Amino acid sequence: MSPTRSFTPVSIALVLSVAIAIASMQAARTAPKQPKIDGRVAPLLKVGNLSFKDLNRNGVLDPYEDWRLPVDRRVADLLSRMTLEEKAGLMQITSFNAGSLDDYLNQRNIRYFILRDNLTARELAARANTAQELAEKSRLGIPIVFASNPRNHVRDNLVYEEAEAAGEFSSWPGTLGLAATNDIKLIRAFAEIARAEWRAAGIQKCYGYQVDVATEPRWYRIQTTFGESPKWNAEIAREIVLGFQGPALGPESVAQSIKHFPGDGPVDKGLDPHNSWGQWAVYPTPGSFFKYQLPPFQAAVDAGTSSIMSYYNNPSNERSGEQLPKEWWQSDKQQFEEVAGAYNMTLLTRLLRGRMGFKGYVNTDTGVLTNNAFGVENLTAPQRFAKAVKAGVALFSDSNSPQGLLDAVHQHLLEESDLTPEVALLLKEIFQLGLFENPYTDSEVAQKIASSPASAARADEAHRKSIVLLRNDRKLLPMTGARKLYVEVMAGQPASFGGRGGAGGRGELAGRRGTPAVNGTAALKALLSKDPSVQIVDSIDQADVALVWLRPTVYQRPEHDYADIALSPLTGVDVAKVKQIEAAKPTVLVINFINPWIINEVEPGAAAVMATFDVKAEGLLDVVRGRFAPVGKLPLTIPADQAAVDRNAPDVPGFAEAFDYAYKNRVSDKYVFGFGLTYSK
């Protein structure tokens, strides 16, 4: 017989209490966690001890208002409640204008806005809160997504649509400078710091970052890339996406719109696609498209970028080698459809979604429906909208009216059902960002985060690490001890997309001077004069050493035949004077490489040569004076001379050119991607 087990009342009570405790712990693990709810207009609904916003004010907890439900279900419910007009409005993103906001929100149904003014974090947050309140009053209470171009980098001058704000958040070197640090952990830290600053200020979407591979040295927008290496660009792209967004998009994320797909580096002779004369992308080297242009975008896609920005450039069949699989060709003789990226179904749907696995939405660049509608100039506005939607576009940049899209539906160029999947992607982003629950922020906290000394210290570290020592064969550096120093800064005029000397283009923003730690000789002298061991002299004859900082800008020839990167008065450099200074005294020549300039006339005469990439002067002087040993590496290959530039393949990075492309100095070092010295060698 099996033994009989008896249970006492005490043992039964103990077993029950344990079971209840286990059940309670399991329930706690599975119970929904209440997110922070801030409803300044919409009333709150209570379900037990949980709170929800009654965004449509009908007294019922609708599925789209229920944060416990999966995002896809919330999206589907909200879509079913939206009118055609509301869907079309959601597919527009325009520059923010407080005076027009009520009209934009309630008549045009726009919810995506680009911030282009250079305000403090406190001001941005306060204004965003006011705007979000107005959005919460709307029929369905759909919140606003505020977007911005990058605003955490040193810029001498601010440029519309590229770098419209600087100096109000932590101030880092330019993106080329971040690449030059050769420190992927520091780049990730930058992204995480910027994310916290942006989100606190009420900005939830970044028009960036720009991961185009810089293959054509004359291209104006190299300044805002991470350089010429597809591999290094891909590593950086991954960290930028993960740093800004996190492993998944959430209430603390800043959504990225990685640009400019499929890569704007291979422009014709450096001419920029913001202008009709620069519209062509050329791929003369067979296989270059997949080998060099796409890896950074693939890395961003794999990291989960929320959106991708297409560009204006129009792929040239006449000047391109074989790039695409034959089954993607338009015909036996036509490889590419020669239209701007926003209209190119092969690139956006077959390549980006089909082959690369992109799950987010496509955001056009500004003006693709109007001035930059390359290849579709003969189409009406509704036809352009229809072609772009069919190609795979969800969000039209700087379009302040959905009327053309509505007309496309009314003219039966599109069905409302064509808009639905694109609107679903946009709504998914807004839900994931947590904006339906809490679109508001604390303006004082925002300012505190933006002014963090710890963030400023990490940014200063990046400035110092970004500086590249190219030559020091005379051991002039570090420049320690007492010195009589002659100082000169030579700077080009602010360039625009049209460039200096060119017609058209979007130029410097009036009254905005960026973050000029040094905007000229006087500013640099003032900074140096704080060191009591340095005596600034006004004449080269009085000096025992000279410091010359060249800060050129690209010159766009009026004939629009090519962009000029040779150092000359046209790019802001008096070459004869530089050579005169170098001949008179040992000279530290510092060159700000926002493009890979042609330096063969000024480099040989210097005693030491350094490269900067939009850096604070304080960081440069720390390296010059020996307070920090240089560790930076070139993110670009510097061309040997004008002949090398003229011969370069615009779709191939400088380090991979098929001829002796790189500049070689007098000690036989080549200034190629990844090169950089330090004081110990």
PLM ranges: what are they?
Residues 2-14:
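Bacterial N-terminal signal peptides that target proteins for export
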Residues 1-2, 295:
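Accessible peptide chain termini
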